[in-house]
UniProtKB/Swiss-Prot annotation:
PTM annotation, UniProt: N-glycosylated.
Natural source organism: Influenza A virus (strain A/Kiev/59/1979 H1N1)
Domain notes: Intact N-terminus is essential for virion morphogenesis. Possesses two apical sorting signals, one in the ectodomain, which is likely to be a glycan, and the other in the transmembrane domain. The transmembrane domain also plays a role in lipid raft association.
Region spans: Head of neuraminidase: 91-470
Residues that, per the record, bind Ca(2+): 294, 298, 324
Subcellular compartments: Virion membrane; Host apical cell membrane
Protein name: Neuraminidase
Amino acid sequence: MNPNQKIITIGSICMAIGIISLILQIGNIISIWVSHSIQTGSQNHTGICNQRIITYENSTWVNQTYVNISNTNVVAGKDTTSMTLAGNSSLCPIRGWAIYSKDNSIRIGSKGDVFVIREPFISCSHLECRTFFLTQGALLNDKHSNGTVKDRSPYRALMSCPIGEAPSPYNSRFESVAWSASACHDGMGWLTIGISGPDDGAVAVLKYNGIITETIKSWRKQILRTQESECVCVNGSCFTIMTDGPSDGQASYRIFKIEKGKITKSIELDAPNSHYEECSCYPDNGTVMCVCRDNWHGSNRPWVSFNQNLDYQIGYICSGVFGDNPRPKDGKGSCDPVNVDGADGVKGFSYRYGNGVWIGRTKSNSSRKGFEMIWDPNGWTDTDSNFLVKQDVVAMTDWSGYSGSFVQHPELTGLDCMRPCFWVELIRGRPREKTTIWTSGSSISFCGVNSDTVNWSWPDGAELPFTIDK
């Protein structure tokens, strides 16, 4: 074979190999395309597009080694359509209270980045429930937690996180600078109310969907303050109560009607010989019921009920099962303030059912320890101390604190009634536990059910002191 023939032969072989390789590559591409079509042909692409991918990252140093923890969750999409929460349903009939959430924030905070907080409360939209809380601008087990027993400081802020989660910098949303606060959802957006400033000139800042819409200046220059629990929204209007004046004498109390963050009406209560602070409010059949704290002279709780025009009625829970702390032993009640052990108090709540009332209270008469729910079938109007049901949720030996009401609207639950719920603050640290340099709390919550429940204790459970305290 001469050289020219060799060149032609080698070229032909190379061309043949190239053609075969090209055919194989084309076949491979066709095979992949067909396989992909078979796998995806019957799937609902809309469902995939409606998913939300949420990635949480936490970076820290462990024994001089850098650790990055990444947790990716694929969450099925929710219908986020806005709607006006009607608020015109009656309270659901219930037989007791089922545990709903527990955040264990103090226990987790011994080794994790958890905010120092107090005054937690819960509020729900038609899509979710969130825990709101007042931070101290500090983390547990850190030097800035020192002295956080103080109620009012420029470092405090209203923040929120998903219910049941320990409040941390990684899951919390800033809401407002505040040392007293409230928040609620009208079905279209969050209304937040944050009070901050000096005792003799504090200002309440109203925000709607995060934008400042209104301010309210202290009118008595004596520590303007609000609910420390959720406000109430009915048919697009939201309602809150504020107090200004002495904590141990006659003060001034105003109800505000707010629409999309703007005040449309306000009135001052004509309530001589009554004291209203830190009201726990809920909607019921289109009206608003608030059960409050008398820090002046009542060991039973005052109430105010009003409609959307702010026409109101006032009174005190008549039952001889007293709801405040401190308080006397149960006995003869009154529809006026019960003056025995009536000074001071603690934020609390009750739910009215006709002439009956569910009363939430500490188990101790004199300190913020333990918690129980009591059903008095005639307690709203009668003064005896007879009751039918008592459900324990925190043992007498464990610390409790503030408590308050919140509701779940039918738009959230799918029920045809308003589900009553409550939360309990579990305070730890100072002033009672003097081995610590800080004051903070965790929280638990319960919702009313018309089925079986249980007596038990769900305490905070943290072992003190922490490293920073030693």
